[in-house]
Protein backbone atom coordinates (compact mmCIF):
# COMPACT_ATOMS: atom_id res chain seq x y z
CA UNK A 1 0.00 0.00 0.00
CA UNK A 2 1.37 3.40 -0.96
CA UNK A 3 0.34 6.74 0.47
CA UNK A 4 0.58 10.21 -1.03
CA UNK A 5 -0.74 13.01 1.12
CA UNK A 6 -1.08 16.31 -0.72
CA UNK A 7 -0.85 19.73 0.91
CA UNK A 8 -2.66 22.63 -0.71
CA UNK A 9 -5.32 25.18 0.07
CA UNK A 10 -7.86 22.44 -0.59
CA UNK A 11 -7.08 19.28 1.42
CA UNK A 12 -6.52 16.03 -0.44
CA UNK A 13 -5.23 12.57 0.47
CA UNK A 14 -4.57 9.55 -1.75
CA UNK A 15 -3.29 6.00 -1.41
CA UNK A 16 -3.10 2.91 -3.61
CA UNK A 17 -3.19 -0.81 -3.01
CA UNK A 18 -3.63 -4.07 -4.89
CA UNK A 19 -6.52 -6.40 -4.07
CA UNK A 20 -6.33 -10.06 -5.01
CA UNK A 21 -9.98 -11.10 -5.08
CA UNK A 22 -13.62 -10.04 -4.80
CA UNK A 23 -13.44 -11.01 -1.13
CA UNK A 24 -10.60 -8.53 -0.64
CA UNK A 25 -12.63 -5.83 -2.39
CA UNK A 26 -15.55 -6.61 -0.07
CA UNK A 27 -13.29 -6.21 2.98
CA UNK A 28 -12.01 -2.86 1.69
CA UNK A 29 -15.55 -1.62 1.12
CA UNK A 30 -16.58 -2.86 4.58
CA UNK A 31 -13.80 -0.80 6.13
CA UNK A 32 -14.83 2.25 4.10
CA UNK A 33 -18.46 1.74 5.17
CA UNK A 34 -17.38 2.10 8.79
CA UNK A 35 -16.18 5.65 8.09
CA UNK A 36 -18.91 7.11 5.88
CA UNK A 37 -21.04 9.99 7.10
CA UNK A 38 -24.28 11.59 5.83
CA UNK A 39 -23.60 13.79 2.82
CA UNK A 40 -20.57 11.85 1.54
CA UNK A 41 -20.09 11.24 -2.19
CA UNK A 42 -18.20 8.19 -3.47
CA UNK A 43 -17.20 8.14 -7.14
CA UNK A 44 -16.32 4.75 -8.66
CA UNK A 45 -14.32 4.90 -11.89
CA UNK A 46 -12.69 2.31 -14.13
CA UNK A 47 -13.22 0.57 -17.44
CA UNK A 48 -15.82 -2.06 -18.21
CA UNK A 49 -15.29 -5.06 -15.95
CA UNK A 50 -12.91 -3.22 -13.63
CA UNK A 51 -15.03 -3.98 -10.56
CA UNK A 52 -17.17 -0.88 -10.00
CA UNK A 53 -20.39 -2.83 -9.52
CA UNK A 54 -18.61 -5.32 -7.26
CA UNK A 55 -17.46 -2.42 -5.07
CA UNK A 56 -20.89 -0.81 -5.04
CA UNK A 57 -22.66 -4.05 -4.15
CA UNK A 58 -20.22 -4.83 -1.32
CA UNK A 59 -20.48 -1.32 0.13
CA UNK A 60 -24.28 -1.25 0.07
CA UNK A 61 -24.61 -4.72 1.58
CA UNK A 62 -22.23 -3.80 4.39
CA UNK A 63 -24.09 -0.57 5.17
CA UNK A 64 -27.41 -2.43 5.10
CA UNK A 65 -26.11 -5.21 7.33
CA UNK A 66 -27.35 -7.78 4.80
CA UNK A 67 -24.67 -9.84 2.98
CA UNK A 68 -27.18 -11.23 0.46
CA UNK A 69 -29.16 -8.05 -0.23
CA UNK A 70 -30.24 -7.81 -3.86
CA UNK A 71 -28.31 -4.85 -5.31
CA UNK A 72 -29.29 -4.47 -8.96
CA UNK A 73 -27.17 -2.38 -11.28
CA UNK A 74 -28.93 0.95 -11.99
CA UNK A 75 -27.71 0.97 -15.60
CA UNK A 76 -31.22 1.52 -16.94
CA UNK A 77 -32.99 3.05 -13.93
CA UNK A 78 -29.97 5.41 -13.49
CA UNK A 79 -30.58 5.78 -9.74
CA UNK A 80 -31.47 3.18 -7.11
CA UNK A 81 -32.32 4.42 -3.61
CA UNK A 82 -31.65 2.54 -0.36
CA UNK A 83 -33.10 3.63 2.98
CA UNK A 84 -30.35 2.47 5.32
CA UNK A 85 -30.20 2.77 9.12
CA UNK A 86 -27.63 5.58 8.97
CA UNK A 87 -28.82 7.53 5.92
CA UNK A 88 -30.39 7.23 2.49
CA UNK A 89 -27.95 6.05 -0.16
CA UNK A 90 -28.41 6.90 -3.83
CA UNK A 91 -26.64 4.45 -6.14
CA UNK A 92 -26.26 6.03 -9.59
CA UNK A 93 -24.89 4.68 -12.86
CA UNK A 94 -24.17 7.53 -15.28
CA UNK A 95 -22.91 5.41 -18.18
CA UNK A 96 -25.89 6.36 -20.35
CA UNK A 97 -25.73 10.08 -19.49
CA UNK A 98 -24.66 12.22 -22.44
CA UNK A 99 -25.29 15.84 -21.41
CA UNK A 100 -25.27 18.13 -18.33
CA UNK A 101 -29.01 18.65 -18.79
CA UNK A 102 -29.62 14.97 -18.09
CA UNK A 103 -27.64 15.27 -14.86
CA UNK A 104 -29.84 18.20 -13.80
CA UNK A 105 -32.99 16.19 -14.54
CA UNK A 106 -31.80 13.36 -12.29
CA UNK A 107 -31.73 15.71 -9.28
CA UNK A 108 -28.86 13.61 -7.97
CA UNK A 109 -26.96 16.49 -6.38
CA UNK A 110 -29.80 18.88 -5.53
CA UNK A 111 -31.85 16.72 -3.15
CA UNK A 112 -31.32 16.14 0.57
CA UNK A 113 -27.67 17.05 1.34
CA UNK A 114 -27.61 14.33 4.02
CA UNK A 115 -27.93 11.61 1.38
CA UNK A 116 -24.88 9.54 0.52
CA UNK A 117 -24.21 9.30 -3.22
CA UNK A 118 -22.45 6.30 -4.73
CA UNK A 119 -21.74 7.04 -8.38
CA UNK A 120 -20.48 4.77 -11.15
CA UNK A 121 -19.06 6.43 -14.29
CA UNK A 122 -18.65 9.77 -12.45
CA UNK A 123 -16.77 11.29 -15.40
CA UNK A 124 -20.16 11.64 -17.12
CA UNK A 125 -21.26 14.06 -14.38
CA UNK A 126 -18.83 16.74 -15.52
CA UNK A 127 -18.78 19.85 -13.35
CA UNK A 128 -21.84 18.67 -11.40
CA UNK A 129 -19.68 16.26 -9.39
CA UNK A 130 -19.06 17.77 -5.93
CA UNK A 131 -15.51 18.64 -4.95
CA UNK A 132 -15.95 17.11 -1.48
CA UNK A 133 -15.84 13.43 -2.37
CA UNK A 134 -14.06 10.08 -2.27
CA UNK A 135 -12.76 8.84 -5.63
CA UNK A 136 -12.13 5.12 -6.06
CA UNK A 137 -10.32 4.24 -9.30
CA UNK A 138 -10.08 0.57 -10.28
CA UNK A 139 -7.99 -1.07 -12.97
CA UNK A 140 -6.89 -4.57 -13.95
CA UNK A 141 -3.53 -5.55 -12.47
CA UNK A 142 -1.25 -6.22 -15.45
CA UNK A 143 0.20 -9.71 -15.64
CA UNK A 144 -1.60 -11.09 -12.61
CA UNK A 145 -4.65 -13.26 -11.94
CA UNK A 146 -7.87 -12.04 -13.62
CA UNK A 147 -9.46 -11.18 -10.26
CA UNK A 148 -6.57 -8.96 -9.13
CA UNK A 149 -7.17 -5.19 -9.19
CA UNK A 150 -5.22 -2.02 -8.55
CA UNK A 151 -7.23 0.43 -6.46
CA UNK A 152 -6.46 4.10 -5.86
CA UNK A 153 -8.53 6.02 -3.31
CA UNK A 154 -8.40 9.81 -3.31
CA UNK A 155 -10.25 12.09 -0.96
CA UNK A 156 -10.68 15.77 -1.80
CA UNK A 157 -12.15 18.46 0.40
CA UNK A 158 -14.16 16.84 3.17
CA UNK A 159 -13.41 13.43 1.67
CA UNK A 160 -9.69 13.76 2.43
CA UNK A 161 -10.16 12.97 6.12
CA UNK A 162 -12.19 9.83 5.33
CA UNK A 163 -9.52 8.47 2.98
CA UNK A 164 -6.68 9.30 5.35
CA UNK A 165 -8.52 7.56 8.19
CA UNK A 166 -9.16 4.53 5.97
CA UNK A 167 -5.44 4.34 5.18
CA UNK A 168 -4.65 4.43 8.91
CA UNK A 169 -7.28 1.77 9.62
CA UNK A 170 -5.82 -0.59 7.01
CA UNK A 171 -2.31 -0.12 8.42
CA UNK A 172 -3.65 -0.92 11.88
CA UNK A 173 -5.51 -4.04 10.74
CA UNK A 174 -2.48 -5.28 8.79
CA UNK A 175 -0.59 -5.42 12.09
CA UNK A 176 -3.19 -7.77 13.57
CA UNK A 177 -4.45 -11.27 12.83
CA UNK A 178 -7.75 -9.80 11.63
CA UNK A 179 -6.59 -8.22 8.36
CA UNK A 180 -8.45 -10.89 6.35
CA UNK A 181 -11.34 -11.30 8.78
CA UNK A 182 -14.98 -11.07 7.77
CA UNK A 183 -16.48 -7.72 8.73
CA UNK A 184 -20.05 -7.47 10.06
CA UNK A 185 -21.38 -3.99 10.70
CA UNK A 186 -23.09 -3.58 14.09
CA UNK A 187 -25.74 -1.14 15.18
CA UNK A 188 -24.18 2.02 16.60
CA UNK A 189 -25.21 4.30 19.42
CA UNK A 190 -26.30 7.93 19.41
CA UNK A 191 -22.71 9.14 19.01
CA UNK A 192 -20.62 9.36 15.84
CA UNK A 193 -18.94 6.04 16.66
CA UNK A 194 -19.40 3.01 14.40
CA UNK A 195 -18.66 -0.66 15.02
CA UNK A 196 -17.89 -3.89 13.18
CA UNK A 197 -17.46 -7.47 14.37
CA UNK A 198 -14.31 -9.09 12.98
CA UNK A 199 -14.53 -12.87 12.54
CA UNK A 200 -11.86 -15.40 11.57
CA UNK A 201 -13.41 -18.84 10.96
CA UNK A 202 -12.12 -21.62 13.17
CA UNK A 203 -10.98 -25.01 11.93
CA UNK A 204 -12.09 -28.34 13.37
CA UNK A 205 -12.35 -28.02 17.13
CA UNK A 206 -10.78 -24.54 17.09
CA UNK A 207 -13.54 -21.93 17.57
CA UNK A 208 -13.91 -18.75 15.56
CA UNK A 209 -11.75 -15.82 16.60
CA UNK A 210 -13.67 -12.58 17.00
CA UNK A 211 -12.90 -8.98 17.83
CA UNK A 212 -14.80 -5.71 17.98
CA UNK A 213 -13.57 -2.87 15.77
CA UNK A 214 -14.67 0.61 16.83
CA UNK A 215 -14.31 3.76 14.78
CA UNK A 216 -14.40 6.76 17.11
CA UNK A 217 -13.76 9.97 15.15
CA UNK A 218 -12.62 12.96 17.14
Give a label for each model feature.
Residues 2-15, 109-169:
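Short phosphate-coordinating micro-motif centered on Lys-Gly-acidic
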Residues 41-43:
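Short hydrophobic/aromatic beta-strand immediately N-terminal to the Walker A/P-loop
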Residues 52:
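Conserved lysine of the Walker
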Residues 66, 71, 75, 79-123:
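Conserved nucleotide-sensing/catalytic segment adjacent to the nucleotide-binding pocket
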Amino acid sequence: MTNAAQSSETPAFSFSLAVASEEAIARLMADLALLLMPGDTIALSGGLGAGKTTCARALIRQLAGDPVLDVPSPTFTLIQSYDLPQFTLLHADLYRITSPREIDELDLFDNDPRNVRLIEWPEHAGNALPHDRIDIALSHHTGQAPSRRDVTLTGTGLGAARVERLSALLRFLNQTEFADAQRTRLAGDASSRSYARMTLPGTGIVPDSTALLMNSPR
